[in-house]
């Protein structure tokens, strides 16, 4: 029994020694990895420019800030010019990254643009807060945006002209919205604005208006329809 106990202790000590050695190696490896990462951060320098979708502004700014925090010698500049403008800037070589809220067209891919999906966003249909209507069908939305329905009374609201607000041609949000409703190139807009924020501000201040915005930037200045 004594011998057995001694063997058990010896085995235990050996196991502990081996575990300690492995822990030391792991700690050393971790320290080396940390040092290597730190050196890489210090060595990386320069600037990155990106331009494009206004609906990606919050995401792009957050990514830029996080990247610059990790790599303090790198400057990331972001401009929000619209999806198509961002892709055009990428293809012309004036920016490093083009942010788009629409899929790349075949011609853009053929010219060298490579698509990387980084997030999925929704589109909210919004109206002026004083509008009594709470929901619309997809068919009703299509009829409003193509000019077939022009008065809120036709969709169970108070009688008032419907003011149709949207994004400018080339906007990724506009492209996605019109594609979902199958109304591409058929819409009649009272105002075509160059950013998601501008659409939301216009709808908030214009009685009887309707528009669409990125779900990511939706706030209580407008009413989202169900």
Task: Report residues per predicted region.
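Exported/periplasmic ABC-transporter solute-binding proteins
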Residues: 2-226
């Amino acid at each position: 029994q004594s011998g057995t106990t001694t063997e058990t202790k010896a085995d235990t000590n050996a196991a502990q020694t081996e575990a300690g050695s492995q822990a030391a190696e792991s700690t050393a490896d971790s320290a080396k990895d940390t040092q290597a990462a730190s050196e890489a951060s210090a060595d990386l320098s320069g600037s990155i420019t990106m331009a494009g979708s206004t609906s990606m502004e919050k995401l792009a700014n957050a990514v830029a800030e996080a990247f610059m925090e990790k790599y303090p010698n790198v400057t990331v500049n972001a401009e929000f010019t619209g999806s198509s403008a961002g892709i055009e800037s990428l293809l012309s070589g004036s920016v490093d990254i083009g942010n788009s809220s629409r899929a790349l067209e075949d011609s853009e891919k053929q010219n060298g643009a490579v698509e990387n999906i980084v997030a999925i966003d929704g589109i909210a249909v919004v109206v002026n807060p004083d509008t009594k209507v709470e929901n619309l069908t997809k068919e009703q939305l299509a009829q409003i945006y193509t000019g077939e329905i022009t008065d809120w009374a036709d969709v169970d609201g108070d009688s008032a002209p419907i003011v149709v607000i949207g994004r400018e041609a080339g906007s990724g949000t506009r492209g996605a919205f019109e594609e979902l409703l199958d109304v591409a190139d058929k819409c009649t807009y009272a105002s075509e604005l160059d950013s998601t924020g501008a659409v939301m501000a216009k709808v908030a201040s214009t009685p009887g208006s309707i528009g669409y915005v990125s779900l990511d930037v939706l706030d209580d200045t407008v009413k989202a329809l169900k």
